[in-house]
Amino acid sequence: MITTSSDYKTIRIVSLMITHSCNLNCVYCFEKHKDFGKRMMSFETAKEVLQKEFDLFKTMERESNDRLAIEFFGGEPMMNFELIKMVYEWVKGLDLPFPMMFQATTNGTLLTESALEWFTSVKNDFRIVVSIDGDELMHAANRGVSMSKIPTDYIVKNWPNSYFKMTISKETLPRFSQGVIELTTKGYRVTSSLAEGIDWDKNDANTYKQELLKIASFYLENPQYKIEQPFDLTFDKLRYDTDVPPKNCGVGTKTLIYDTDGQSYPCHLFVPVVHGQEKVRKVVDTIDFYDDKCMINDHCLKCSINKLCRTCYGYNYLDRGDIKSRNLTKCKMLLAELQIISSFQVQYFMQRKGSLNLNDIEKLSDALSAYELLHNTEFDFD
C-alpha cells in the first residue's frame, strides 16, 4: 500500500540521488562537485537498489503501521523527472506487503504544467517538499531566482499537509521573522532551520534571538496557526539517563541514500557530490553510525546541554575533517533558539491548560525542565 496518511509512521527513509545536476546555485549549497548533466541514475540502478531495500524492510521488526519512505533527491530531482515516473509505476505494480510513500524534495522551479498534472494524479502517494527561503527578497538573496517561478498556491491546494523548507543564511537572518509570518499568514506550512557551514558571531546570535521572539509572539497571539519547526521541537531527551547523548538524526541507521551509480551512503551529506569520491569513502568505511560515542568529542561531551544540541555530522566532516568536530560558532545560535523555544512552549501550553491531553502535559513538563536548565546558561567562548 502506498500512502502519505499521518496514520502511518515512517521508520526508514531511503533516498535516491537521481541526478547531480541542478539549475540553481544557492549561496549555502553544500554540493560542491555538481557536474550539470553527466551523472543521472538509471532505471535499472533504481530498481536494483529499491528491490534490495524492499527485501530488507520485509524482514525488519516493525509494527503494522510502520512505513518505508522513498525520497527522490538531487541536485534538482526534476532534472530526471522521467525516472521518478518510471520508478513510481514500477513500485505501484509490485503490490508490496507493507505501507510506503514517496517524497520529492525540489526547488520548485521546474514544476512545469505537465509535471504538476502528473504529480496531482498521484498526490495521495506523494509528498512534495519545496524550498522557499522566506519572502521574495530573502528567497532571491539565497537562491538567485524569483519566488514567482514556484507554483506555491497550486502546491498548497493539492498538498495541504506538505510544508515549505526555509533555510536561514547570514544574509536573510534579519528578515527571518518577517519571512515566516508572511508565508504562514498566506496559509503555507513553513519549517525553518539555520544554514550549515556558516561562521556565526555574537551579533547574529542576538539577531536570531530577537527574530525568534517575534515569531513566538506571533504564534501566541494567533493560535489558529499550526506550530512548525523549530518551535515544535521536543525536550524529552533531557529525561534520557545516559552519559553519551544519542545522535540527533538517523544518519547511517534510519536513513540511507543511494548515489547515481547505486553506491550507498549514510545520508545526503555523505555523498561524492558533496565531498568528492575519494574523501567520502574514507569516513564512511571507518565510522560506526550505530555507536553514539563516535559522534561526539570530549569538548562537547562536557557541555551541560549536549542532549539538546543538534549538529550535522556530514558538515562537520566537510568543514573540519571530523564528524565529531562541531561548528562552535553555532553554539550561541542554538542556545538562543533553545532558550526562546522552551520559554515559548511553557507559555503556549499554559494558554491551553484547560484542554491539555497527557502528551501535551508531558511536553509542558519537558519544556519546564529545559527552561530551568537553559535560562541562565551562557557560553563564554566566541
Q: What is the meaning of each model-derived region?
A:
Residues V271-D382:
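Flexible mid-to-C-terminal extensions adjoining Fe-S/redox cofactors in radical SAM and related proteins
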Residues C22, C26, F72, A104, ...:
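Conserved, mostly hydrophobic/aromatic
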